[in-house]
C-alpha cells in the first residue's frame, strides 16, 4: 500500500511538472513573441517534425539541417575537412538542456517538442530578458549548464536514451501498472546532491513559475541543478562552439548561415583557429585537461567577452520566419465557413527587409595587413560602439582605413597627418614579434579601442559615480593573440589627474596609451620626459614606430585609465578596490617588448540612422561625417602650408629670415611639436 501511494505520488508530481512545463511554454510564447512570429515558428516546426506515438519532435539532424550548422552528418556535413566546425552535437546538447527549463533536474535532456523549442528560442536570443529575473546572470548559468559535459554520464548516450524512453512511454499502457514516467531521470550532475547557492538557483526557476501558482510543486521535488558548479565544459566542446561563433559572428537577421560555414579556405580556417586558441589560452592552464569550471567560464565571458553569444540571436531567429507560410488560404477558408475573425496579415514570400547592413570594412584606402574576418569577429565579442546595440556587426558600424605603417610609412609625421585629423572613435592595431631571449619568434597582436578623437585626450565628460557606465564610451586595451586579454576602461575618469590622458602623442617620445605623462620643464632630461605606465595596463610606442611595450600590471602602478584584467567596469569602486590586492598576487603581471611589423588605425563610423540627431522642432540636424571633416582639415592644412610659404618669401627667403619666420609660426602654434600634442587647445 505504501508502495502504491509512493508510485501515485510520483506520477502525480510528474504530471504536475509536465503540465507546468506546457503552461510555462505558453507563457513564454505570449510574452516574448508577436502573433505572426509564433505562427511562423509553428509552421517551421511542425512541417519538419518527426512523429512517434503522436508526439511531434525534432532530432539533431533536423535541427542542424534547418540552422545550417555542420554536424558531421546530413547535408551540412563535410563543411570543413578537419571537422572543427561540426558544432551540431554541441548545439543539440544545449537545446536539449534548455528545453527542459526550469526542470533540468528531472526533465533534461528533453525531447525537442514544440513547447521545448519555444523556450529554447527565448533563452538563446535576446528575448531572455523578459523572462529571466536577473537577465545575463541567470542566462550565464543556463548556458554553462547546457554546455557542461565533464562530470556527467556520456552525453550522447543520455540524449539517445532520453529520446527513446520519453517517446516509448507515450504508448498505450495499463493505468494500474507502474508504467514508466513520461519524463527521464535527467543528467547525473543535475541530481540535488548539495545545496550550495540553493536560494540563488531556486530564484532562477521561481521567477519563471511565480505567475503559475506552482512554486510549492517546484520546491517540493524539482530543485534546479545544485551541482552545476561541480560540472565542467570540456575543451573540445568549447572549442567547437567558439569556432562556430567566430565564423557566424557577421550573420545578419535571416541571413544564410551556409554562407559562413561552407567553402572556407585553409588560410581562413587557420585564422579562425588562431583566435580560438587565443581565447582558450586565457583560461587557467590546468583546465585544459580537466575542463572549464563555472567560475572561470563566468569570469571570462562577463569581463572580457560580453558579446560572445550574440551570434546565437540571428541564428535561432531563423525559426521565426518561414518561406512556405501562406496565411491567405487559412483566411479564405475561414471566410467560406462563415467564421468571423480578425484579418490575418499575409506574410511576404521573401524575408522582411531589415535595415541594410553596410560592409563592416569600408572599401578604398589600404589593404589591411592585420584585420581579417576572424580577427574582426573576435573584436565584436568585446568592443562596444553603440549604447543601444553594442555589437559592431549588428549596429552597422563602418571601419574606415585611417593609417597604415605599410601604406603611409613608419613616420610620426605621417601618423599625425592621418590620425590627428580623424575626429571620431578609432581602433589601434599593432602586429609584431615579442622580443625574448629565445630564438623562436612569437607573433602577437595588440590594440586599443579609443572612443574619443586623439586630440581630445582629456575631454571625457564628467559623470556621476552613481550612473552605470556605458561600455561604448569607455576605452579598452587588449591583446588578441597569442593570449586573449582585455583591460576595460575605468569608469572613474572624473577622478583621474590631468596628466593621465587616454592617449598622448609627441614627436619626441612617441605614442602613449593609458600612461602618466611627466610634466615638462627645463630641468627634465632623457628618461624623465618619457610617459610612465599607470593603472591596470599601458601601451607605449616609440617615435620611430619600430618598437612597442605592452604592460599589464593588475593595478600595481596605482590608478589609471584601464582596469586590471578580469574586472568589469560595472563593479563599484568599493568592490574594485577590494579585488585588486587579491589579483595582484596572480601571474598576470607582465611586460612585452614588441618589434612592430605593422601598425594600423581604423576609424569608426556609426550608422547614419543611429547617429541622426533632432533639433528642438523634431527636424533632423544635418551632420558632417568624420571623413568629410578629415578632408576639410587636410584642405585647411594645405592652405596653411601655402600661407607659411608666402610668409617665408615675404621675409626675404634668406636662411636666417626663414628661421625667424619659422620661430614666429611656432610661437603662434601653427607648426611644431605642440601642434600635435593632445593637450593643445585651439
From Swiss-Prot:
The keyword Cytoplasm applies. Residues 344-357 have a biased composition (Pro residues). Residues 166-200, 331-357 are annotated as: Disordered. SMART domains: TLDc. It comes from the Eukaryota. Its main location: cytoplasm. One of its GO terms (cellular component) is cytoplasm. Keywords: Cytoplasm. It is found in: Cytoplasm. Residues 176-185 have a biased composition (Polar residues). Residues 369-605 form the TLDc domain. PROSITE patterns: TLDC. Belongs to the RTC5 family. May be involved in a process influencing telomere capping. This is Restriction of telomere capping protein 5. The gene is RTC5.
